[in-house]
Every structure is written in C-alpha cells, then in structure tokens.
From Swiss-Prot:
Name by which UniProt lists this protein: Serine/threonine-protein kinase KSP1
Biased composition (Basic and acidic residues): 80-89, 813-824, 953-964
Compositionally biased intervals (Acidic residues): 56-79
Active site, per annotation: 207 (proton acceptor)
Gene that this sequence comes from: KSP1
Organism: Saccharomyces cerevisiae (strain ATCC 204508 / S288c) (Baker's yeast)
Compositionally skewed regions (Polar residues) per UniProt: 744-754
Length: 1029
C-alpha cells in the first residue's frame, strides 16, 4: 500500500481531484471505494490495484522498453497465436507444455503483449497484469450507455463510473428486480445492446453474470463491467474461463470427445449462452442447473429435451421460451442474437403472473402523475393538440419518467418522486439557459447546473473516515467494509444463485412417508370376508339361512335368534318390530314354503297379543305361536295374510290345502287356460316378488287359479254348525295383560265391538266340510267384507235385503226364527232373477241354512265378489251408511248396533284387521248381478259398486237429510243424476218396478242415490283398470 493511498484513505485528495467518501468492497486484486470528483462534481468509483507477490518475476522495466505500439503488438500477437497453434497441431510444442509454470509464463507474456503502450505508460509497473489488461480492453471498447465507462487511470488507480444501484446480483437477492413485463424487457434489452455493441467491436466478455452487471440510477440503466476475462479473439482454446454456472457446455472437456477438444470454441457463442442464464436469473431469480455438464441431472434432462425448462420453471410463458431457444442450445451454431431480439420484440409476457404484476402499481403511479403541474401552453404557431417539439438550439435535457422501476422501500420511492417533481417543475417554468449548462465527456452527466449536484448522485452527508457510520443515503447500497484486517475477498467468493428443484421436496416427502411404514391396507379397504358377506353375497343362494332368519324361521338348533325375533309392544294399538329387520318386514314379502317345506298358512298366523312381556320366536319353542303384525293401512299379500290361531290351538285351525279355482267352487269344469295357469303356478316354488303387488301374470284368472296357499279361511273364524243350521263365530282376542282369552259369540250383543272380520256371503252354494283335513277354500280376493254382527252366509238361496218383519229378533235365538227364515226364502225365490249384483252392505249376515238353490239360479258360472274398499276400516267407530230410521237393514254393518245408529259419519274399526283391497285386474272376474238383491225386479244388468266414504256434507247430499222416526226419504229421479248407461233403462226399471216404492218408503236413502255413488266408483275403477292393462 503506497503513501498516496494512505493519505486518500484518511480523507485526503487523490491526484488533486478525488476525495474518498466511503469504502465499497474489496476485490481479488484491490480495493474499491466511493469518491467525489471535486473537479467535475460527480461521484466516481476508485479502484486501487496492488501487485500480487508472484508477479514480480515476470515483470520488469526491460519489458517496457521493448514494447511497440499497439498496432505492431496486435500483429505480432496474432502471428504468435497462429504459430503456437501450428506447433500444437504438429506436436512441436512440447517445450511450452513442459511445466505448468512455464505455461503460465507464456500466457502472461501473451496477455502483456496485448496491452498497448499508452496504457503501460500511464500505469505503474507494480500493478497486476489483469488490471492492465482490463484497462486496455476498456480503452478499446470506448463509451456506451450500457457499459461502465473508464473515466481515468494513473499509477495504481483506475477511476470508473459510479453506479448507485449496485449490481444485479444484490438486486436479485433482495428481490428488488421489477416484475412488470415492460420493465424486464427494458433490462434485457440493455444487456443485449451492450453485448451486441462489444461483439461488433470484436471484443467478447466471456464472464457475463449478474455480479458483473451494474445498475445505474433509478431508471434501471444497466452497465456491463469487469472485462478481466474478455478477449479480442474470435475463437479460443482456453476453456478455463468464466463462472461455472454460466459457462456454456462446450467449455467443459467432459462434454467433448477427443477431436472436439482440439478444436477452438466460438467466444461470441459463449456470451449468448451466459445471456440466457442471466435472463432466467432476472425473471425467476434462479439458475436452471448448477453446471452444464453430465454431472448435473437437470442439465441432462434439458439436453435431451429443451422443454424440460417448463418442469423447472412451471410459470414460464411460451414467448419467453422462444427467446431462450436461440440462446440456451447445446449446439453453438444455433445461438443467434438477432433472433433473440426478434423474439423479444414479439414477447407478450414472461410468466403467467405478469398480468397480475402489470396491474399491481398502476393506481399509485397514476395518482403521482396526476399531481404534476400542467404542461405549458405551446406557442400559437404550433397546433394545440400536439406537444411542442424541443428546439435544436435548446439543449435542455428533459427528464423522463419511468414507471418500470420498483423500490421495496417506500421512503425511497417517495423521495425520488419528490426530487423528480421538483426537477420537472423547474424545467417547465424556467427558461432554458445555455450559460448555466455544461457538457462533459461525451454524454456522462451532460446536464449539470452550477448550483446543484448531479442527478445521479445520492443525497447524503459526508463524514470523515474516523467517524464512519451510517449515513442518510437512501439510494446507494454499498458494501460496508468495517474491518480492515479481514482477509481479501476473492472475485468468485459470493455464493451463486440457487437451483430450483421442484421434485426434491416431493420425493423427500414420499420417502419419509414410506420410511414410517404406517400404511395398512386394512385401514382403507374392506376386508374380503365383509365384502363377500354383506355386499357380494347378499343375493347368493348360500344366504338362504340368513333369509330364513329374516322370515321368522329360526332353525339354528332351536335357539333364539335376535334377527328373527319379533317383539310386540302395546303402544296405542300399534305394534313395532324391534331390530334391524324392521325394514325388511315393511318392504319385502316373506318367502314361500319352498324353503322350509311348510305351507305359508302354517307360518303366518294372527294373534292379538298386546302383552309387554311376551315375545314369539318362530318355531324355536314348542307350543308357541307365530305372529306377524302389520302396521295399519299396509297392504298384505294374500299368501301372507295372517290367520287367527289361538295359543291353545283350539280355534281357527286351518288345514294345509290348496284353494280351489272358481270353476270348482261354482261346479263347472276349468277351462284350458285356467288349467294351464293352475299347473304353471303349482310348478313355481317361490312367489317372493315385491315388484308386482296387484299385477297378475298371464291370464285373467291367475289371481283365482294361480295362487297357491290361498284359503277362504285366511280371515275366517272357525265356524260351528248349530242345530238350527246356524253358524257361530269364535274369535280369540287378548287385550289384557294377563293373557286371558275372551270367547266372543256373534249371538251376543254385549260384545259387538269385538266382532271379528267375516267375509261376505256368496250367492253360490258353498259346502263346508267338517273334516279338518279336507275343505274347499276360496281365495281372499273373492271375499267381501260384512258387518261384525253377521254370520257366515252359506246359503245359496236368494237374499232379500229389505224385510218388513222383526229384524231385531235376528240377533237373538227366538222361537219364531225358523218362521222368519222360511218367509225370507219364499220371498227371495219369488224375486229371484239372474244378473243382479249384491252390494256388500245389502247382503244378509245370517245363515239361512244349507238349502238347495232354486232351479233358475245359475251357480256354475256366476259368483259374487265384493269390491268395497272401506267396508272395514281402522278407526274408532263403524263407517255408518245411513238407512231408514225405523227399519234397520241387517246387511249394513253399522245398523245392527243401535248405539251407533245415532252417530252419523262414524267410521267402523276392526282392531288388527287389514283392509280388503281390490286386485289390479279385478275387472276380469265374474261380477254379474244376482237376482236375490233389491234389484230383482229390474231388467238391466248394471254393475253397482259401493261408495268408499260417506261422511260430513257429502252424505247429506247423496242420501238426504236424516230425521229421527221419519220413514220418508228424499229420492231423486233417474233423470237428475249421472248414470252409467242409457237413461231409458233406468227410467223404465224404476218406473215399472213396485219394489222401489217399498224401498223408498222403508229407507232414508233411495236406491237411485245408492246407484249414483256406485256407478261413479265403478267408472273410476274401470278407468284405472284400462290404464293398467
């Protein structure tokens, strides 16, 4: 360290011009400090170069004396390089490669020969050769706006242009690089301009990197510096130049074969490769790979496919990739600077986030611009709409406003904007004066005022070296040097930018997750046993045992099974089935007898047991009864309807037999279709289909002939034929908690509320066999509801629903009962006529004895079927269908009870008995009107159905207003209502019949009113059946 530098370090003026302000950094061969040019009034960077220890042996005064001018040296140098290349090719350069020291000496001589004599004359002999070589290169470059200018050099000092923004590396590390597309393009364009300029000069940098790119001013003016490794050779054999991460692939011997290693590389192509890496640093702040050879996997991926850059930089836009296509190519011949510039001009965005960053600060900048003073009014000679051009005589430098610069520090932004506003205001309102302007050094700080500092100089206070501390400088961020005794900082000492490895953390995550080995397949998948049993094996045939348990057949060693258990708890008359099989009872019909070999009639029995502590479990225990309780209002299939079986098995024992078809009941031969349907249905084992509840199969008689296990005794109590040919009904009910059975006799009127459901009488002959093993049964669908007081009518004789005798004696065993029966038979035989339908509410409930029907009765092809839907309802009372007040109709369910006759509109209720429903194809059955009804005298074949409900005002409108003790009824004429058929038929019938007068006098409701509702119901049913067919 010389005495001059000691004085300069302590605050003295160097060379009578430069005064030190502060230290900036330490280089590999000197110190860099910030100084003030007292002559030019500007800030400069002073680089002090000291001599290395091993340079003395190659340097001496004798070398300077033998130096020639620059032109001669260049010629000699070229000749020397050619000679050396020729000798290397012929193998005569063994003496030059004898030792590394000798090789280094030859290189030193070659570099020293390149330095011009003017540079050597102004520099000291004690400085290093690299400094002299760099000064010589910069003197050849000249001045350019994007190259750091060499202002002065003398002795061991080099004076260079000061760039207040620091280098690009520090800006990238501080995330101070602007992210707008226009700003990035401005930076990249300046770098390309500088490289293109020096390449046109025949100079190649060979060490382009962010550390060698400086930032000058607030407008992000780029300055390229550090020309120590630059060369003027178009091609070179020296491959050990540059920074590792920015070196092109051809600079690494491992990427070359033996032949390629002997060939020189193009120095211009090396700069283009480094430019592409720097562009990625500016945009993404990362390097694509650490080194461009085979040791880097990222580079290997890139060498195989250039689009691998999208894997490293996922947000890179394709336009930016097009720019890099002419820079980052393995083949140097494909690198083209002109194509890079062309693609850069066509670029719209660098990343997918540019749109966000472009709109980020627009609002703030617009408000700052709006605060500027208005522009002055131009002269009258110039158009008002156009701005006035600056006169050539006025060399005033108008400041430019750059939106592209982005400071992290808000205070810096505000101070810079304030200084700009002040300068702009002074420029607008002050007259340009040439006397106050001076121009220096071909464009460096050309606009300076005598009373103000340069615009590029930061505003801060100057302090002495001994009072060094933090300054108020807000613009420059120099590297502070506080410890003088620290070791020298080498040129490549700063850590390079990082490498993005997007897959590394993902791989580590999966490796760590796998290392824990906590994954268990059973935690995420269903075990095979569960899959087979509950999912795949649900409908297999191997699951029959499971279905039997669900259908209340527990055959597992006669043990109780919770799945097949049924708990009946008395809760407001409703029964609930506990357990998960409740849904199966509701939605699935029970299996047929094909599983157990037993008849469904023996499995599905009815028992009314409301005890809280009683439970029944299939066939698990002897002597126990099986009950299947259904919710009120739910449809019960015929083969699943319950039977009345008392716990003692004394009453209502239903034999196991198949129901006969309709032809057998009526005494005729079955047709071919009926016989075929019967055989086909007998061959089928399982009727376990829930898809069709009311739909019948092929023929019209399938519901009669095809259903096995149908019995007339499904809802029929056990009948006992008395001495007077009267049938008594026995029902077993248990409504008490003590389990006592109450034997109900239909002859007693005290227990009339406990009457059981009895099917309606048939007009055909029905013979009951007292033998328990043999009986002829009819299907449930052929049964019609009757009142709870009614006996089973087994007589085939005519029935007269309208009697003038003492009807009240029917409910008691009086002595004149036989006489009344004889009178009724005679009257019915006289009124007997074919084709008359007996409504359910008009049928007799007394057994008139097993009597041979009249000769004119057709019993072989006709049967009576009830279509009444609400003959038996679930509720609190009987469904009253009003008739005459004095003469009660015995076939009306509610009129037999005098207590209920006073409650009009009440609904009938039979606890625990389901509603009989009309089958889907009921219209296909025989519904011919019989002669033994009230329409025996009529000459029409009208089919009359019973109305569903008559309550409230509707009963009054249809049946007239009831008055106590009055035998008159308000009858309407046939012409005043809608009748299904010709009106003449009904008019003649009611006009020519004398029986309707007696009926109108004896009943409140006329027959015509009965027909209105019946025909309406028939039409509705007929329309439904037509839609279903």
């Amino acid at each position: 360290m010389t005495l001059d530098y000691e004085i300069y370090k302590e605050g003295g003026i160097l060379n009578n011009r430069y005064q030190k302000i502060e230290d900036i950094s330490e280089g590999s061969y000197g110190y860099v400090s910030l100084a003030k040019d007292v002559r030019e009034k500007r800030l400069v960077a002073v680089k002090y170069i000291f001599k290395l220890e091993d340079d003395g042996q190659y340097d001496g005064p004798q070398d300077d004396e033998n130096d020639c001018d620059s032109s001669d040296c260049d010629d000699d140098e070229d000749t020397k390089v050619d000679t050396d290349r020729h000798e290397n090719e012929n193998g005569n350069a063994s003496s030059n490669n004898g030792s590394s020291r000798e090789k280094k000496h030859n290189l030193y001589k070659h570099k020293k020969s390149l330095i011009s004599s003017k540079v050597k004359s102004r520099l000291s002999n004690n400085i290093c050769l690299e400094a002299m070589y760099e000064v010589d290169i910069q003197t050849k470059i000249g001045r350019h706006q994007n190259i750091a200018a060499l202002l002065d050099f003398f002795d061991s000092y080099i004076i260079m242009e000061y760039c207040s923004g620091g280098d690009l590396y520090e800006a990238i590390k501080a995330d101070a690089v602007p992210k707008k597309t226009k700003s990035i393009t401005h930076i990249i364009t300046q770098i390309m301009d500088a490289i293109e300029y020096v390449h046109n000069k025949g100079i190649y940098h060979r060490d382009i990197k962010p550390e060698n790119i400086l930032i000058s001013g607030i407008d992000w003016t780029i300055k390229l510096t550090d020309w120590g490794l630059a060369t003027t050779d178009k091609t070179s054999m020296d491959r050990n130049v540059g920074s590792e991460r920015y070196m092109s692939p051809e600079l690494f011997d491992s990427n070359l074969d033996i032949k390629e290693r002997k060939e020189p590389y193009d120095c211009a192509k090396v700069d283009l490769w480094a430019m592409g890496i720097v562009f990625l640093n500016i945009v993404f702040h990362k390097n694509p790979f650490s080194i461009a050879n085979q040791s880097d996997k990222s580079f290997c991926y890139f060498a195989a496919n250039r689009e691998a850059l999208f894997d490293v930089f996922s947000t890179m836009a394709y336009d930016f990739f097009q720019v890099l296509r002419y820079s980052l190519t393995i083949d140097p011949a494909n690198r083209d600077l002109k194509m890079m510039r062309t693609e850069l001009q066509n670029l719209s965005e660098y990343t997918l986030d540019d749109e966000y960053y472009n709109n980020l600060d627009e609002g703030y900048e617009e408000t700052m611009i709006d605060g500027l003073p208005p522009q002055p009014v131009p002269p009258s000679s110039a158009p008002v709409s156009l701005p006035t051009p600056i006169s050539s005589s006025n060399k005033q430098h108008m400041p430019e406003f750059k939106k592209d610069f982005n400071f992290n520090n808000v205070n810096e932004r505000k101070r810079s904007d304030v200084s700009q506003n002040q300068n702009v205001a002074s420029g607008f309102f002050k007259k340009p004066s040439t006397q106050q302007q001076k121009f220096f050094n071909q464009g460096y700080n050309t606009t300076l005022s005598t009373h103000e500092r340069a615009k590029s100089a930061p505003k801060f206070k100057f302090k002495k070296r001994n009072k060094y501390g933090r300054t108020d400088n807000q613009f420059s961020k120099p590297v502070n040097i506080e410890d003088r005794k620290k070791s020298k900082i080498l040129k490549k000492s700063r850590k390079p930018l990082g490498i993005p490895t997007p897959n590394t953390h993902m791989n580590n995550f999966f490796h760590d997750y796998k290392a824990r080995d906590e994954f268990n397949t059973r935690d995420f998948f269903t075990p095979p046993s569960v899959q087979h049993r509950y999912m795949e094996g649900f409908s297999n045939n191997n699951n029959k045992q499971y279905r039997q348990n669900r259908n209340y057949n527990n055959n597992n060693n006669n043990s109780n099974n919770n799945h097949g258990s049924n708990y009946n708890n008395f809760n407001n008359g409703n029964s609930y089935i506990k357990g998960w099989n409740k849904n199966f009872n509701k939605y699935r019909r029970p299996s047929s007898s094909s599983y157990t070999g037993k008849s469904p009639l023996s499995r599905y029995n009815m028992s009314y047991n409301h005890n809280n502590n009683s439970s029944i479990n299939g066939y698990a225990r002897r002597g126990s009864t099986t009950t299947v309780q259904h919710s009120p209002g739910a449809y019960i299939p015929p083969n699943a309807r319950n039977h009345h079986v008392s716990p003692t098995n004394q009453f209502l024992r239903v034999p196991q037999s198949t129901a006969p078809d309709i032809s057998t009941v009526l005494g005729g031969k079955p047709s071919y279709q009926e016989h075929y349907t019967q055989d086909s249905m007998d061959s089928e084992g399982d009727h376990d289909s829930d898809d069709v509840l009311f739909t019948l199969e092929e023929g019209d008689h399938d519901f009669v002939n095809g259903m096995d296990n149908l019995s007339i005794n499904d809802h029929l109590p056990h009948t006992t034929v008395g001495s007077h040919n009267e049938v008594f009904v026995h029902a077993s009910t248990n409504h008490n908690n003590n389990g006592n059975n109450n034997h109900i006799d239909t002859n007693s009127t005290t227990n009339q509320y406990h009457r059981q459901y009895i099917p309606p009488p048939l007009t055909t002959s029905l013979h009951i066999n007292n033998n328990n093993n043999e009986s002829n049964e009819l299907p449930d669908l052929l049964k019609s509801p009757a009142s709870s007081e009614a006996h089973l009518n087994l007589s085939s004789g005519p029935i007269d629903p309208i009697l003038t005798g003492n009807i009240g004696n029917r409910y008691s065993h009086s002595s004149d009962s036989k006489e009344l029966e004889q009178e009724r038979r005679l009257s019915m035989e006289q009124k007997f006529k074919n084709g008359v339908y007996v409504p359910p509410h008009h049928r007799k409930s007394f057994n008139l004895g097993t009597q041979v029907p009249p000769m004119n009765m057709k019993t072989s092809n006709e049967a009576t079927l009830s279509v009444s839907h609400n003959s038996v309802n679930f509720g609190g009372s009987y469904n009253s269908r009003r008739s005459s007040a004095n003469e009660s109709n015995p076939l009306h369910m509610n009129k037999a009870l005098e207590k209920l006759s006073s409650s009009p509109g009440a609904k009938s209720s039979f606890v625990g008995f389901p509603k009989p429903l009309l089958p889907r194809n009921h219209s296909s059955t025989t519904i011919a009107l019989q002669n033994e009804d009230v329409f025996a005298d009529s000459n029409n074949d009208a089919i009359i159905f019973e109305d569903e409900e008559y309550e409230g005002e509707s009963d009054k409108m249809a049946h007239g207003k009831m008055e106590g003790g009055d035998n008159e009824s308000s009858s309407t004429s046939p012409d005043e209502r809608q009748i299904f058929g010709p009106y003449e038929i009904y008019a003649q019938t009611f006009a020519g019949s004398t029986h309707d007068k007696k009926l109108g006098a004896g009943r409140k409701t006329s027959i015509q009113d009965e027909m209105v509702g019946s025909l309406e119901q028939y039409k509705n049913n007929w329309l439904i059946l037509q839609q279903q067919d």
